[in-house]
């Protein structure tokens, strides 16, 4: 990969995406909305671009009917943001264990371009994948090209979640708040009652595994 010399505008950075490409999209709190919005604006030059991700947060815009000839979502988890598109047949779902996704990227679903949202580089040139490392680590390792939205509001997290600027083909600077979830508005009386009952069964010091949905929330 080429050494990044400076930040570029999103129009230039997203020229890395071409028709027929498979594109990984960073997910959850790291959803790169600025890149997705600018990619949507380039739809007229693109056909059959496959977008792969687990969960994305907020309005993904490119899941709308007017984009279906240009972008096709192939999600690895049906999150709220794309549920309507999957139900209406405008997007597909690949049922797969989370632990098997790195093998998919390595052998069955090669990634042409990865769209990330990362922290600014530190003094050693390392950016952080922030709050969503999960399958992004594997996507980074196997993508042919990497385009990163650099956002000062992305937290630096420890562990195997760093990427050096030498690995980035394009960097776009855009500061914006990360997507957030307000769980307080999703839980009703039934969920709260279930949670109260379960809480009474948990000993102090226990380790909990929590899933996704209104009850664990």
Spell out what each predicted region is:
Residues 1-217:
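Conserved alpha/beta enzyme-core scaffold
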């Amino acid at each position: 990969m080429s050494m990044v010399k400076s930040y570029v505008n999103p129009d230039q950075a997203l020229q890395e995406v071409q028709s027929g490409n498979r594109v990984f999209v960073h997910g959850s709190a790291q959803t790169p909305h600025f890149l997705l919005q600018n990619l949507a604006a380039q739809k007229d030059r693109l056909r059959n671009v496959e977008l792969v991700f687990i969960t994305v947060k907020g309005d993904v815009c490119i899941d709308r009917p007017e984009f279906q000839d240009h972008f096709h979502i192939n999600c690895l988890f049906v999150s709220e943001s794309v549920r309507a598109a999957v139900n209406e047949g405008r997007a597909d779902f690949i049922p797969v264990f989370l632990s098997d996704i790195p093998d998919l990227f390595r052998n069955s679903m090669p990634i042409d371009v990865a769209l990330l949202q990362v922290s600014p580089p530190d003094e050693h040139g390392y950016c952080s994948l922030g709050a969503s490392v999960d399958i992004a680590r594997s996507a980074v390792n196997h993508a042919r090209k990497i385009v990163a939205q650099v956002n000062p509001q992305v937290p630096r997290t420890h562990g195997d979640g760093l990427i050096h600027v030498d690995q980035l083909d394009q960097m776009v600077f855009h500061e914006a708040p990360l997507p957030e979830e307000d769980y307080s508005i999703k839980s009703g009386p039934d969920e709260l009652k279930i949670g109260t009952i379960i809480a009474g069964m948990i000993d102090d010091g226990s380790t909990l595994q929590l899933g996704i949905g209104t009850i664990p929330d």
